Amino acid sequence: MRFDILTLFPEFFTSPLQTSLLGKALANEVAEVHLTNPRDFTTDKHHRVDDEVYGGGVGMLMKPEPIFAAVESLPCLPRRQIVLFTPQGRPMDQPLFHELANHYDQLVMICGHYEGVDERVAEHLVTQELSLGDFVLTCGEIPALTLLNGVIRLRPGTVGKVESLKKESFETELLDYPQYTRPAEFRGWQVPSVLRSGNHALIERWRQEQQIQRTRDRRPDLYQKWLKKSDTSDP
């Protein structure tokens, strides 16, 4: 799978692309990531990528010409999505990551800066607008790295034990259960005895109960989704 990231700050991705899961996935050619700087596609001597907002307003806006030129310079695989990160975009979640990982060969991600990008980019170039959440960040590189990580880890060959992906939070609308490691006692806090019992049926039941309780207490919205899904799956 190919990822193209349009960014004014390619160095932002230097360390993340060389370490941990992403670094291994790229080294094993599970995916390929290409960084493109829109500034390289400017035509003026100052390499300007931003300008004032029509109608007045605070701050600067990224110009459309370098962004269009940068995207049009890229290879176009058959199943491609061009993503722009904006507050009004679709919230990123696990179903979205699965959708992108399973149905597309190429993701082009446009990282905004300043007050955003010219609306014509969203109207005539972008195929999907995405949002990391209801808060403001300084740049689009942060959601781009999040999307990159979330999608690549679902691609075959990235995670060693595929079964572990199916048991993670959000895969079944439920949060993950509590997990413990050695020592069995730390500062008087004990690992639940059921986890040390060796009875796998009891352990599985305890984990499911903990998932349901934790989701109900901490994420009532997800709990309601899980209830609805459980109702529809009953015979």
From Swiss-Prot:
Subcellular locations according to the entry: Cytoplasm
Keyword Metal-binding part of the UniProt annotation: no
A GO CC term assigned to this protein in UniProt: cytosol
Gene3D superfamilies on file: 3.40.1280.10, tRNA(m1g37)methyltransferase, domain 2
Major location category of this protein: cytoplasm
Reaction equation(s) it catalyzes: guanosine(37) in tRNA + S-adenosyl-L-methionine = N(1)-methylguanosine(37) in tRNA + S-adenosyl-L-homocysteine + H(+)
Residues annotated to bind S-adenosyl-L-methionine: 112, 132-137
Record-stated family: Belongs to the RNA methyltransferase TrmD family.
Name of the protein this chain belongs to: tRNA (guanine-N(1)-)-methyltransferase
Gene designation per UniProt: trmD
